[in-house]
């Protein structure tokens, strides 16, 4: 959300100034708690980095240090045991890297390219991909949510295939 505000809010507004302060707080939190355990929390910081870079905001944080720490963070949370990718709730590089021009692609090229091939190999005949997790404690909610998650996976996988067409 901070990145969105930095990108779209007018620079002379209070909300933009608040986003600048919150980005500093978030960065300090990241540094203090590095490395993070959560792939989702990690993805939020990668997204903040991308927004700031896209908007050429280089004066709020040490962007080079941020980039180096994020590179280590990404390597920390990606699941490299690819045998469980089809069956478990895991972290793939696409959570952080959505193009070959990403600052994080080259150091993760091999696993990104593997994911590309994995996506192609695991597509079902109907064009979808399976959801590899369940909400066992919430069967009624899962019956609905599984379709939503499957749609999300389809969209993300098609975008990944298009971007990483090897």
Give the residues covered by each predicted segment.
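Preference for long, amphipathic alpha-helical scaffolds in soluble/luminal domains
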Residues: 2-166
């Amino acid at each position: 959300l901070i990145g969105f505000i930095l990108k779209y809010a007018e620079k002379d507004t209070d909300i933009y100034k608040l986003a600048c302060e919150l980005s500093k707080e978030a960065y300090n939190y990241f540094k203090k708690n590095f490395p993070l355990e959560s792939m989702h929390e990690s993805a939020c910081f990668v997204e903040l980095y991308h927004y700031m870079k896209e908007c050429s905001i280089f004066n709020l944080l040490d962007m080079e240090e941020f980039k180096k720490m994020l590179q280590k963070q990404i390597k920390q949370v990606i699941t490299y045991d690819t045998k469980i990718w089809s069956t478990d709730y895991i972290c793939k590089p696409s959570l952080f890297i959505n193009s070959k021009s990403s600052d994080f692609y080259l150091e993760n090229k091999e696993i990104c390219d593997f994911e590309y091939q994995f996506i192609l190999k695991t597509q079902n005949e109907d064009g979808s991909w399976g959801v590899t997790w369940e909400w066992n404690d919430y069967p009624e909610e899962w019956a609905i949510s599984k379709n939503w998650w499957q749609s999300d996976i389809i969209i993300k996988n098609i975008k990944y295939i298009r971007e990483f067409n090897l």
